[in-house]
Amino acid sequence: TLLASSAASDVYKRQLRSNDAYTPGGKAGFRPDRAVTVYSQILKRLYPHVPVVIGGIEASLRRLTHYDYWSDALKPSILAESGADLLIYGMGERVVQQVARAMRNGYNAKLLRKIRQVAFLSDESYVARLDPAATIRLRSYEECLTDKTAFGENFTVIETQSNLMEPTATLVEAVGDRCVVVTPANTTLTTEELDHSFDLPYERAPHPRYAGKGDIPAWEMIRHSVNIHRGCFGGCSFCTISAHQGKFINSRSERSILAEVEHVVKSPGFKGYLSDVGAPSANMYRMGGRDRELC
């Protein structure tokens, strides 16, 4: 998910958009609000015994208590409402492989809960067995509903942990009679790992099922662009890029970038120029702190 479903539908003062840049023909109304929750609930209803793993920006940014602008209310973790079994947060290439290996012989909660950068619901007895020195108990969802400072305290802890290069703390937040457990994030991918992800043979095109249904505006804007790094150290209060991708810059190699440029140049409809060579926000290619040990 590139954009949260509610944000794709919403404009100023909670009015519905008349168009949607992510659908063929730019037409609005083809995606439900809170799509991850809606689709997860459908899957669990149709296939109750099949584990559902959610990820992407909509799930990632709702892994704990969060403010929902559309309803003007605090919402619990998306795990509590969606019924999903596991949540992968942040950029998940490394994690999704670990999850796939752990589930090779079926759903194994014990193995999955040992993986970094995931979230899941548990009972209090599981939390009691966690190492107290490596566990941070957040204020509960119910406390956040009645006390604004509780929600603020939680955010401070979450933001502090997301700013660490190598976080070690497991976060726990009570929701009703259960707990949301968030394992610490992985370090950023190495350049080699990031290159491998970008070097996969992507089609760089909309799904064939959309053929003949009109141009997809968002696709037309980025079809001849190249992403050269991840992360943003800006930390702007209005933006969630650093919360999802992290504040440490993760750059591709020049070889990988140039290989993609050659592929784009040879693609159908190329107009003779690259529309953008950049990253999520600004060009921070290979930027970083002088003393990484302090991070």
Segments from the language model and where they lie:
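Well-ordered, non-membrane alpha-helical segments in soluble/globular domains
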Residues: 29-40, 69-72
